[in-house]
Amino acid sequence: MSMADTNTSINDNAADCVQALIESFRPVETFGTIRAIDSKDIPAPFHSLLAHHSHMTVAMEAFHGHSVSLEVVSVAPDEAGERTSYTREILLRSPVFNDKAFGISSQPDEIPKKMNRVVQYGIVRINTNCLPQEVVARIEDGGTPLGRILIEADLHREVRCVRVFEVMPGPYFGELCLGSENKAVPRTFGRFATISISEQPVIELFEVVVPSAE
């Protein structure tokens, strides 16, 4: 699915855009159930993590109190064969997890088991023709979160949270984010966001908070 041309069309079709992003890798049914909601209906702490016009990398690091690392799960094949877009499925991980914000009290002897936990799931589609070659190369290298790359590149950019979603994860999500398909992930929330570079829409993102499942 190509990048939407205007903010209005993106807003009107946010759910379709999310479905298209997910289906770049698997049927939506295996991912879970996704429902568009109003941002005022998102409970804490999800609201502060999602309902903003900023990079999720920054939000996650502030929330968990530690820098996050990137894991590229999968890269979608370039169907057009022209390498004009780059789509990948990712996880953000942190050695520190803010369980308390989710109402969980971690015991000291549990800390080693929680090292490098998944804090965010995401899918991103990038129009690579609209970014400097060195930025694209760094993104495709897969070693640094996207938000950090764009910040360090000092590009004129606008992050826009277009629509938020309630997510009821399926077994795939549990296995990927918690390491066990038998361990249910609680109801969580995500967002569809866009990033414009020099007023041109360049990036689409589906970003889902991974809550504590203790």
Question: Model-predicted segments: where are they?
Answer:
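Composition-driven recognition of glycine/serine/threonine/acidic- and proline-rich low-complexity segments
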Residues: 2-214
